[in-house]
Amino acid sequence: MELTKVTVTTGAFNYSPIIKTALVGGLASSLIETATVNTTVAPGSTGNTTINYDINTQSVLYYSTNVTANWTLNIRYATGTSLNSALAVGQSVTFVMIVTSAATAYYNSAITIDGVSITPKYQGGTAWSAGNASSWDVYTYTAIKTAANTYILLAAQTQFK
């Protein structure tokens, strides 16, 4: 593992390091991961039918306002940085999207990685065709990079009330 010391003497400073390390046969406990709570723009609102999920900024993305239309989820590393360039072959990332539904249920109807359509492997073997009304739908995804621009994407939808 390589860490770098940063000293700031004046002004404001935001530092968001990426530390890559290998842990083989080890035990990690009490990990804390970042969750983004979006209280203003739900999927489908104001024509927002494509959601860019930047995995470098959160492991969980929660929309607390009601979903108003089906949406496409685009998975990428960051604005201007592809997932393909961030992951090596054999690496994976797991992330979650939580949406709030009112009486009319909507769902994640399409998925892309770096803007390219991908067909996931769905838990239970059948693609979801609807969301769940008056509840939270939790979508869990694992993307495994198997070659350049090639992934296995595992996807699950779970209802919480």
Give each language-model segment a name.
Residues 53-57, 87-90:
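Flexible, charged surface loops at secondary-structure boundaries
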Residues 48, 66-161:
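Acidic, glycine/polar-enriched metal-coordinating patches/loops
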Residues 57-64:
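Short carbohydrate-recognition loop motifs
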Residues 1-56, 148-161:
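Glycine-rich, low-complexity segments
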